[in-house]
Amino acid sequence: MSTISGMPGASVPTPRPQAPPPTPPQPNKFRRDSRLAAVYDSDIAPVWTQPFGKLLLSQVAPLIGKATLLDVMCHTGDPGFDLLRRCPEARLIAVDPSGPMLDVARRKAGPLLSRRVFLRSEPCDPKLPFDEAAFDLVVSNLGLYESVQPHLLLRELTRVAKPGAQVVVTLPLRGTFAEFYSLLETELAGREVEQQRLSAHLLSWPDVDTIRGWAKAAGLAEVELLIAPFTLLFAGAVDLYYAPLIEFGPLLAWKSLFDRDARGMQAVFISLRDRIEQLCTQAESPPTGLRPSLRRPLTLTVRAACLSARRPL
């Protein structure tokens, strides 16, 4: 038995494992990948980007005349193109760090390209390549979610907006995918380091106070925050793990909880798979002989938020 000097018989508590300090936020390595662009409009936009985009569009005030719009991190063009249909005299400047994404956007723009639609490949972080007070409306659908420094990006969006112009952004809030994280937390029982990393990861998702703090720091006025949750349905664990939305998105962060412990990661994800499958097959069975037992989907909640504000006059 180990003892503390001067205190015979007192046992020394075993040091608890400590998680390494959080690493600086890293950009999604798939963000500029052509494989992501190839499936974005078919597999990701309908269930992810479009619900956020509709929320954004609902908060944009009407524009009259030859307004100049800016869409930052425009992906494949929407909802910026929707704004153009609302504003027949406006022109749209849209930027995104992904060349393959912009190639899709160019095809969708059709004859409007270089007439009312102007697309540019730009990193977007940490500074936008535009003069101050240049745009009548500035939007970013999920741009803050994809930014490694969202508070700085919001400041840039404010800087390039004209005095009095509206700035409208969307992003998911803390609590998104809560059902999955609850299951994962259970599977991490006894893995203290991974549990600490998971806690840090969950805290990295912004809450309402965080977003309001970003808006205040950016100097925005008339701040309104609308929260409109929606749900995603997955047929089971395999459908979840291999859904492009997950595979090219948060799966990277989930794997990073295990650092280089590939064996531990595999064990946890296999156990998690089995637990999800168990949940999906626990639907009430119909009377014998009528039809096979029904499965129920895995439901994940997305806490979608839209920040609408204006640059002060």
Regions found by a protein language model. Name each.
Residues T3-I64, D78-D82, R86, M101-V104, ...:
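Conserved class I S-adenosyl-L-methionine
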Residues K127-V138:
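A short acidic, Gly/Pro-enriched loop at the edge of an enzyme's catalytic core
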Residues H151-Q166:
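A short glycine-rich, Lys/Arg-flanked "PGG" loop and its adjoining helix->strand segment in the class I
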Residues G164-G236, F248-W254, R303:
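Conserved catalytic/acceptor-binding region of the Class I
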Residues D136-P150, L171:
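A short SAM/SAH-binding and catalytic strip from SAM-dependent methyltransferases
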Residues T68-K127, L152:
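Class I SAM-dependent methyltransferase SAM/SAH-binding core
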Residues R35, V39, E224-L294:
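C-terminal helical/coil "lid" or tail adjacent to the Rossmann-like core of SAM-dependent
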Residues Y242-P244, V302-L313:
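Core SAM-dependent methyltransferase catalytic element
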